[in-house]
């Protein structure tokens, strides 16, 4: 039962990371000034 709980936790964390990556990509496309530094870093991370 504990293994199942860990699996659910990992899936939720991965889903959040994917959603966050999508949000950053959208913001980069919009060329939001605040996100310009994050976008530079984001280009080096292979999403």
UniProtKB/Swiss-Prot annotation:
This is PhoP/PhoQ regulator MgrB. InterPro entries: MgrB. Pfam families: MgrB. The chain crosses the membrane at residues 6-26. GO terms for biological process: negative regulation of phosphorelay signal transduction system. It comes from the Bacteria. Its main location: membrane. Keywords: Cell inner membrane, Cell membrane, Membrane, Transmembrane, Transmembrane helix. GO terms for cellular component: plasma membrane.
């Amino acid at each position: 039962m504990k293994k199942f709980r860990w699996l659910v936790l990992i899936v939720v964390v991965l889903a959040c990371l994917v959603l966050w990556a999508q949000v950053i990509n959208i913001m980069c496309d919009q060329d939001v000034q605040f996100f310009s530094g994050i976008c530079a870093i984001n280009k080096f991370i292979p999403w």
